[in-house]
Amino acid sequence: IDCGCGAGNESAYLLSKGFNVHAFDISIDAQKVCTDRFKDDSKFIFYHESFEDFNFPPASLIIASSSLFFCNPSYFYSVIKRMTNALPEGGILVVDLLGTQDEWVIREPKKFIGFTYKDIADLFLYEFNLLFHKEMNENLPLLNGCIKSWHLHMLILQKN
């Protein structure tokens, strides 16, 4: 499952490796790009939905790269639960979470959730093994070219 798939770059890679891919994004532009890009690939299914509305089917891999932090905070924990329930034992979850020092978290704390190491442990380590964690705290451009102060936790987890 490619969550918040955008232009479908992760989906394209997974398809090239033989995966069946369910991808969703709330953006009309993403829908247009992906339905055109993968129109001839029967292993690709696109859903024009948000994290809040998506019904996660059973999956061996769920990727939410640079997308999960756009989930409405009031639905965030239920979305994590639905993701967890969709994965079998040994399934992989790849997520990026904002840290507490991220510019968006500081400016709009009701819209974005910032996570500490303890928050991440509390959220995931009961049901997952942590395979990879990289913390990034640097100024990088957004797609529009504006510089943003990013504080990210990039995680790869395997379900127990």
Which residue stretches match the model-derived regions?
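ABC ATPase nucleotide-binding domain "signature" loop
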Residues: F70
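Intrinsic-disorder/low-complexity coil detector
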Residues: F56-P57, L87
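Conserved acidic residues
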Residues: S60
